């Protein structure tokens, strides 16, 4: 069975495949029913409204919002520097809360690549001729992910990638997997689909069609890209060197180049944050790093744990 979206895209969901169990067919159909309405929702308008609501400092509103999210998602405030939910000035202050230093110990392996965030691995693996695996036979392109810049994407053509999804319960600050010096930042306009498993399974080119901010660093492993992907209700994306990058959204790709006084960030240092949750994609070049072979899609990961190591016979192109 094919589904024709209002955008003109056709999706093959085949819920009646003879080899599928009733449960898997129902799951597939449910995922499409969740995803399709998002094509007609005013995604940016809803996200702008959330931007305002999340910063509202009315005590009754923000306390009710914080307590509801804490209860529904099981947020562990004992890890936070400020464990009292009512002490936060706004919902956004709660959502981007700092953790106690001991809450996320870093791997002590000097060659370790640290996990940049709390979350779940959506996918992890190799980039094949510039193509990254999304889910269920769907792929997206590194060049499109980085705003259509072929030169920017070239070093990652046959490299490694890891896609990590942050849920509403997670810590929403993002940290450096390895020390690096910022070379370029790119803000790519786009849509704002949800980025959970249902949309990853059903929306083509999801991560390369949503609004995103990509930061390119020079590291001892060669070029590294950290791509912060927006989603519906992700009210803003910010970095420590620029502040809030979005909103406002932009009509065209916008690029910042850094040279002489470029920011340098240490391994484990905060580099940015999501004001509401979404996804971070980490890219490295060919023969630069090796992921931990035990990690796979669906695994829960924590900030500071080892995602992989510098490759033993490291070679890379800049």
Give the location of each predicted region.
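Contiguous, well-folded functional domains in the mature portion of proteins
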Residues: 3, 11-318
């Amino acid at each position: 069975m094919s589904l024709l979206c209002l955008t003109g895209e056709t999706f093959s969901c085949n819920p009646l495949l003879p080899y599928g169990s009733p449960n898997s067919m129902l799951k597939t159909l449910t995922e499409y029913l969740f995803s399709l309405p998002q094509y007609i929702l005013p995604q940016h308008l809803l996200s702008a409204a959330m931007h305002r609501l999340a910063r509202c400092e009315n005590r009754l509103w923000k306390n009710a919002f914080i307590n509801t999210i804490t209860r529904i998602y099981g947020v562990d405030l004992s890890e936070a520097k400020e464990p009292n939910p009512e002490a936060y000035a706004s919902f956004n202050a709660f959502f981007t809360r700092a953790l106690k230093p001991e809450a996320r110990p870093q791997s002590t392996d000097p060659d370790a690549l640290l996990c940049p965030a709390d979350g779940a691995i959506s996918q992890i693996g190799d980039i094949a001729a510039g193509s990254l695996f999304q889910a269920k036979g769907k792929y997206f392109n590194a060049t499109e992910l980085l705003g259509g810049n072929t030169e920017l994407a070239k070093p990652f053509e046959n490299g490694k990638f890891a896609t990590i999804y942050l849920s509403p319960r997670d810590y929403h600050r993002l940290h450096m997997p390895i020390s690096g010096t910022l070379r370029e930042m790119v803000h790519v306009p786009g849509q704002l689909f949800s980025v959970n498993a249902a949309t990853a399974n059903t929306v083509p080119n999801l991560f390369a069609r949503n609004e995103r901010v990509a930061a390119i660093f020079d590291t001892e492993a060669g070029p590294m890209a950290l791509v912060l992907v927006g989603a519906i209700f992700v009210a803003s994306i910010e970095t420590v060197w620029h502040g809030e990058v979005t909103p406002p959204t932009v009509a065209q790709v916008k690029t910042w180049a850094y040279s002489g006084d470029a920011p340098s960030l240490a391994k484990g240092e905060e580099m940015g944050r999501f004001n509401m949750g979404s996804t971070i994609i980490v890219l490295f070049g060919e023969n630069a790093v090796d992921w931990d072979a035990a990690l796979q899609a669906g695994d829960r990961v924590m900030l500071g744990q080892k995602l992989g190591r510098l490759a033993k016979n490291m070679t890379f192109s800049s």
